[in-house]
Amino acid sequence: MSLVRLLPAWLHAVADYAVGLSLIVVAVAAGGSTKAVAVGVVVGAVVLIVSMLTKYPLGVAKVLPFTVHSAGDYLAAALLVVSPFVLGFHNTATGLTAFYIVAGVAVLAVSLITNYQYNDKREWSPSRAVTA
């Protein structure tokens, strides 16, 4: 479900991989408690795996419908925002807490403006612009 369909699938895919990688890298680089690092590594890894399985421009296996993928986006956003408070590291890992909240809000924002009605025959992508 999106509010407006501004963002094409290929750009959403780029954002997915960027978020997944940045969650892992920032969590490991920043350090902190096991719980604080685990949130970034686990959510980041799941984002990457779901992205690779999704039927969209940068999907690898392309077995998961993009509309189903959207549910994972909303779940990831919620987990990123609430996990510092639920797992109790918001007072000790303030940098990671802020990063997770910002990342969660960004994931939510991207999800709300994505066109989840992806059709690979009609979708513009950078590679099609080169060959056209």
Put a short name on every predicted segment.
Residues 3-15, 64-71:
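Short, amphipathic, aromatic/basic-enriched membrane-interface segments that mark the entry/exit
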Residues 16-37:
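Membrane-helix boundary elements
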Residues 69-84:
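Hydrophobic alpha-helical membrane segments
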Residues 82-99:
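Membrane-helix boundary connector in multi-pass membrane proteins
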Residues 95-115:
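Alpha-helical membrane-associated segments of multi-pass integral membrane proteins
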